[in-house]
A protein has these predicted regions:
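Structural alpha/beta core scaffold segments of enzyme domains
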Residues: 1-365
Length: 368
């Protein structure tokens, strides 16, 4: 199957599961997709193509224009957040409650998105985050860039602003007072009603023998928003321009200019079906070839992966070639979804290149 897909390996898995064809008889060649925003994963038209080709016994091609893509493949989830947030008179958060509903359309299945958005805020004694996926008679929804994180983050940020205004605190000070800092424990206790197939259910299913190696409690090792907030506020001169809630710092006719502060969280590096892998091969002329199954949406994944491999090998960049789409050559990978390309495939590439360098040096010692 030749297809403009972000996930060659997962598409191969999907064909195997749908038609019970041995994976040894399936080959997917991933082609450039252009901008996708998550559309070019494993989709219905992929399976229709395989089904028609098997029935006809002939090659089959399905081609969709932009309008057909938008109306038949999938769309962004429609989401609604309703919540409450409370604090003491001096601005210390006391409780957070969010009820988040996701419209999955006819056949969508998301019910676990945005579950880390509340981790931006310091662990609260009383918190309840409920996320529900529902099916409706609309076009099936699917993952499109920042699934759930954006919506829940905006809802929580809006509540934080309203709360800060009520206690007479500016948005910067309120966030510096309440957001998680490096070294703080991230609360993960009290998980309940985990939907089958959800991220949380996956985490809960991990054996205790593996969990023993995890830090307890789980702490934020880096990435505190405090320094970012201070630097950002300084960049646009927040102290000078902040004039109070609802009061602009400049009025020019009908234009009212004001400033605000906000933060957001996004989850990347998700792992469901298995670990991501990469392979580096050293050729007799001293050049190298990297095999990694990633998507090509115009983000330059071939270049970035080649740069990682070249640096780890100690080779010039022009001596490293990259194969990204052929599942017969490339080991299994999640592909380019959920901000995975550099975070996960990049690490796999780095480790594969380091291992190739180690083997090369060991062989050179034998011949010295």
């Amino acid at each position: 199957l030749w297809s403009s897909t972000q996930t060659p390996s997962e598409l191969k898995d999907g064909i195997h599961e749908a038609f019970d064809i041995p994976q040894s008889k399936i080959k997917v060649v991933g082609l450039p997709s252009g901008s996708s925003f998550g559309q070019w994963w494993s989709n219905n038209f992929h399976m229709l193509t395989v089904c028609l080709a098997r029935k006809a016994g002939r090659p089959v091609k399905i081609e969709l224009d932009n309008e057909e893509c938008m109306s038949t493949v999938k769309r962004r989830h429609l989401e609604r957040s309703v919540g409450r947030m409370g604090c003491t008179d001096d601005g210390d958060l006391t409780f957070l409650e969010v009820d988040h509903v996701i419209d999955n359309g006819a056949y969508g299945f998301k019910d676990d998105v945005g579950f880390t958005a509340h981790d931006m805020w310091h662990p609260i004694d009383h918190a309840n985050i409920t996320i529900r996926g529902i099916n409706t008679n609309k076009v099936t929804a699917g993952c499109m860039r920042g699934v759930g994180d954006c919506t829940i983050s905006v809802a929580i940020e809006r509540m934080a602003d309203q709360l800060a205004e009520k206690v007479g605190m500016d948005p910067l000070k309120f966030r510096l007072k309440n957001q998680v800092k490096s070294g703080d424990a991230i609360a993960r206790e009290g998980l309940a009603d985990l939907p089958q197939g959800s991220v949380e259910a996956y985490l809960a299913s991990i054996p205790e023998s593996l969990r023993d190696a995890w830090p307890d409690p789980l702490r934020l090792s880096s990435g505190s928003t405090h320094e970012l907030l201070r630097r950002g506020a300084k960049q646009f001169n927040f102290k000078k321009k902040w004039n109070g809630w609802g009061r602009p710092y400049k009025i020019d006719g009908s234009k009212h200019r004001a400033v605000g502060v906000g933060t957001g969280a996004h989850t990347c590096g998700v792992e469901f079906e298995g670990p991501t892998s990469a392979l580096v091969r050293i050729h007799r002329d001293g050049s190298a070839k990297l095999y990694c199954s990633v998507g090509r949406q115009g983000q330059g994944s071939e270049t970035t992966q080649a740069q990682v491999a070249a640096e780890a090998l100690g080779f010039p960049l022009e001596m490293v070639e990259v194969e990204t789409g052929d599942t017969d050559a490339c080991p299994w990978s999640h592909g380019s979804i959920a901000s995975n390309t550099m975070y996960r495939t990049g690490w796999a590439t780095y480790e594969a290149a380091k291992d190739a360098r180690r083997q090369l040096l060991e062989l050179s010692l034998i011949h010295i």
